[in-house]
């Protein structure tokens, strides 16, 4: 199935019947936010979840962060693993996503890339496994070991923005943990695809000149030809950036609430 839809600020409409967020080469500024590894209670806007820095570290001493919504111990929850854009960090992605995660009831893990420039490395061949890949999976295993954490195994999403978009299919087509991946204003390298075929979300902006609508349509066509059974393509009224509407639509699609 392949659908293409255009989004507005308040709603989406079909034109033709595949998270952070993801800070970096979008329009997110650098913020220096201290997050204690012991956990930070968030009181703003009634949020009471907990943010942690991951203990797993890359060879460049970069780590990442994760967010557990209020009451996470009480039931299995969906998990989003999100990948930042150029110049980004996981902690910035958590800041972008935590309110949505709290409201919709899912956990977010946002690893840092190995590169201090905030770019990601993906394999060029099916058997290639980069340090970024290993770090992401180390972070995932760390979160799954947290006391009280249980995942909803039917709803595990890998989502990446811009240059981080390529990491989502690279990992989600190799790791059976993931049931879907999302590429937001990003690209997909055909050689980086593994053998698994989870659900796919693709999105971009009608004014995005970095990842144009035409390019994302070509990605959707390629993935469909590669045997992905469900590819969702959405177009929003934005440039190369992420708005609340796009993130909310992604989560609704992922969690089956649209």
Labelled PLM ranges:
Residues 6, 13, 17-79, 159, ...:
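A domain-start/cap signature at the N-terminus of enzymes
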Residues 81-83, 184, 236:
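Alpha/beta-hydrolase
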Residues 84-86, 144, 161-163, 168, ...:
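Cell-envelope and extracellular/periplasmic
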Residues 91-97, 184-193, 214, 218:
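Alpha-helical scaffolding within the catalytic cores
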